[in-house]
Amino acid sequence: MKWFEDFYSDARYGLRQLRSNPLLTTVCVLTLALGIGANTAVFSAIYLVLLRPLPFKDADRLVLVTEYNPGNVAKTGSPLLRYQTRAAQNTVFEETAAYWDVSGGNGLVFGGAGSAERLQFSVVTNSFFSILGEHPSMGRSFSQSDELPGGGKVFLASDALWHRLLGGDLQAIGKTYRLDGEPYTLIGVLPPDFHFPSACDVWLPIGMLGTWPLQDRVSHQFWMLGRLRPEATLARAQAELNGIQEQLARAFPTTDANWHVHVQPLLEEFVGNVRISLWVLFGAVGFVLLIACTNVINLLLARAVAREKEFAIRAALGSARQRLVRQALTETFLVVAGGTALALVLAKVGLSAIVALSAGSIPRFEQPHLSGMVFSFSVALALLTTLLVGVAPGLHAVDCNSSESLQVGHRSGSASRRTTTLRNALVVCEISLTLLLLSGACLMLRSFQQLREVDPGFLPEHLVTVKIALPDALYPKTEQRAAFLHELLRSLNSTPGVQLAAASDRLPLSGEGNWGGINVLGRPVLDSAHAPSVEGRGVSANYFSAMGIPLLRGRVFTEDEVAEGRHVAVINKMMADQFWPGADAIGQRVVSPYHPENVSEIIGVVGNVKDFALDAQAPPEMYSPYGWWNTMNLVLRGSSDSASLVSAVHSEVAALDKEVPVYEVKRMEDLVSHSMERQRFELVLLALFAMVALLLAAVGVYGLLAFVVNRRTHEIGLRIALGAHPRNVLALVMTQGMKLVLFGLGTGVVSSLMLMRLMSGLLYRVSSTDPLSLGAVTVLLAIIGALACFMPARRAMRVDPMTALRCE
């Protein structure tokens, strides 16, 4: 194994060389550890979120089928009848299933008086678990009989619920528990690692809904899952389901026309809109590694220049060129190996920091760890870095002229023109890359500032929200829910410390929506498939005052209108402008295609509210008197602290009904802040990478000029001895350094104008070519570059001529 003996020999010699210059070795190892560690941490995040397969059977063949209505609804589920037709007529799926994640709109109350707790739940077909390849860890799954209307009242529980509320009782299977006041039998417990839909506590069979889903073609609750056959493709599935949808549109034009099908990998539903963000961050951290590599290359080149005489002697004694290159690469490999070992430690810390910074805004970040794939990436990155960093010093080792280097008068450390050009080019490159990163960070900062200045349409200060869930069995009618709410709000509004108490079925910026079609009386009547959609919210009479939503025209609801459930409506400005441009909306009457018997009169227009995101346009929205849902959001504006307000809610709810749980306590200011978590995450990481790049670039410029000054000490001393003023020496070195800085800034500006367009999707109200951002970072980098040039230049102007000449 001669190659191993040679490598061992080179490694021993390389270690001795590295130990002989501990400062340079330490700087190189730390620089590479920073670059490789940051890349490993970000790649680990990308792998966890984007590349890691879903924990389901044949995850790469699982797809999600959704619907959209052009111009009205971007993405929603399907009526159960439509799902059943697609499931029966398709030829591309091995198996299909449907689920309805009900948690967003309704609560499921577990337990009884004094121990009630609201649970998140989903209604699923009996094939739901089999298509995912999941089986209960205890008990059984749903059967076909459970799917029949009026089937047995049974449920499956999550492992977390089984431990939390049932105490991990092995005898719990087969026992009956109260869900929404009605008895349900627990038939199984799912494995601890099963979380779909996310955070679900309970799964119910579709039969518990009764017969209404089999008679309804307008409610879009059910999301369809399909497992593609091995020979089927996504495009083929899309085409086939398009054909089935066209048949449904012809058969049921009033309900199924104007609806389109979208087929996507199930992974896309988990990933959401973070794909672009993570790849941009990966590109940014890749730039950091390149900058780190340029610094290390420059350091190793300086070391190679200083060792020219050593390499010349070895060449003169018969060492082959490839042996010299191998020696240089081996030393580089040892440096990179040390950097990689430290990088894995930094990556572990960095990944934990990334998870903490994401604050729940990035999906699939549960149990973050460095997987085998991440270790493989680190090894590959280390090998690539070795080649990238080691080639230039290795080539320089065999490129030096042996006879010239061995001459008595030859100055050790005098670099060739090609080496000097390469080192200058590397500095220009890192200045350019640093400008790119700083530009991206500045754009994100400007975008985040714009986002923070957005008016959400309400006043979040001193607002606290809590949810309550009324059991369906105890409050089956709208009138009962409205009566409970009316009495609760009356009590809360008379509680000390509470200025205003109100209620709504959905809160702004909560991610919850409830769209529906609307027809205007006096205009052509459109069916549910073609009627324009608006967001609908049920609210109490003083909701607008409590939230601080301004009334623009007309009036808001009275207590009597809410209590009696009168058909009146308040709309936002967006709906008024969209439906009645240039006209008065007050007094207009609207009706839903789903309930043509309920005609509502518009009595007021209020300001727009950001319902889904601060950077999204407010949708047309219609408010109605509250009373439809069993889940209520209480909104309390008070002068006291939030804990006192929440305590008051607990007391008043318990006084009315101890079986009603109180949960999800939030401050509206926190809700607004949380809506910006993803943008804050992107900004902090990008800014951090930019600061690291700025530091490395400054060190790179300083290191190059320090090397130049050290190499030209004799020349500088001679100039001063012959009468050159120290200021001239300062100008000479500063000019040499600033030429590189300015050239790097120029190439960086051009690169930024071209590459920053890739960030357009991440920016809000800021152009990717924003001149203010680009100008600010250019000036900043020029100042930092000038400071980095000044320190070695000042050292040059203080060179003692006699000392310099004696040293030579």
Regions found by a protein language model. Give the residues of each.
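Alpha-helical transmembrane segments
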Residues: 34-61, 68, 350-359, 433-462, ...
